[in-house]
From Swiss-Prot:
The keyword Methyltransferase applies. This is tRNA1(Val) (adenine(37)-N6)-methyltransferase. It catalyses: adenosine(37) in tRNA1(Val) + S-adenosyl-L-methionine = N(6)-methyladenosine(37) in tRNA1(Val) + S-adenosyl-L-homocysteine + H(+). Gene3D superfamilies: Vaccinia Virus protein VP39 (3.40.50.150). It comes from Shewanella putrefaciens (strain CN-32 / ATCC BAA-453).
Length: 238
């Protein structure tokens, strides 16, 4: 399925997951100010890397394991206005994070990670890879972020709220710490079902993490003012 934003176009037909609201919210929210080198882990169609390119002057590295998704990602990058600043690496983040040239290299890391920790795999193999943590566990993801993030760098993620307890347990065993948490409610009056996470490699932080909420739609189904403000540079009809 093709998806057109204000400044770029995505063809995600061959990718594991279609363009999602999760990805758009994460890509619009991640604080990229002053970032010079950005890493998009599990790039899929390339949407996060392209959003980062629109919002910054950084050089962006997209890493994608699946061959079919990587082909689509490269196509989308090539058709964008920022092809000269975005580089695709096909392979695993586990391998890339062990490469000496990438250790401590990135100012910002962005990732919409696999979120099904247990349960049956999706029937379509690419979709299964994109949705299940079998290919990239939270533990492996945090280890890769630790390896690749520069001193005082930042990492932005989006997770299902039900995964937060396990994620926090693993986070406590890493060198990463919370900077900010945003609980996302899909509709006003509903419970939060996603969480935006901002992490850093800074140690012994004395400032408490910032905690807030974001509601995507009001009770009539229309985008909230906060959602419009966040995504209006991307969605065509906003």
């Amino acid at each position: 399925m093709a998806f057109t934003f204000k400044q770029f176009h995505i063809d995600d037909l061959n990718c594991g997951m279609a363009v999602s609201t999760d990805a758009v919210v994460l890509g619009a929210w991640a604080p990229l100010t002053n970032a010079k080198q950005i890493l998009d882990i599990g790039a899929g169609s390339g949407i996060l890397g392209l959003m980062a390119a629109q919002r910054s002057q950084a050089n962006i590295t997209c890493i994608e394991l699946d061959n079919t998704a990587a082909i689509a990602c490269q196509h989308n990058i090539a058709q964008s206005p920022w092809a000269s600043r975005i580089r695709l690496v096909q392979g695993s983040i586990q391998q890339l994070s062990q490469a000496e040239e990438y250790q401590g290299y990135f100012d910002h890391i962005i990732c919409n990670p696999p979120y099904f920790e247990h349960g049956p795999q999706a029937q379509l193999s690419q979709r299964a890879m994109a949705r299940h943590t079998d290919q990239l566990s939270f533990n492996e993801l945090l280890a890769a972020i630790e390896q690749c993030l520069s001193p005082n760098g930042l990492a932005s993620l989006i997770l299902p709220i039900q995964s937060l307890h396990n994620f926090n347990h693993l986070l406590s065993q890493s060198r990463l710490e919370w900077v900010e948490r945003v609980d996302i409610k899909s509709v006003e009056g509903k419970r939060a079902n996603r969480v935006l996470c901002l992490l850093t490699t800074q140690t012994h932080r004395t400032v408490e993490p910032k905690v807030s909420e974001l509601t995507l739609r009001d009770t009539s189904g229309q985008y909230s003012q906060a959602m419009v403000h966040l995504t209006q540079d991307f969605y065509l009809k906003l």
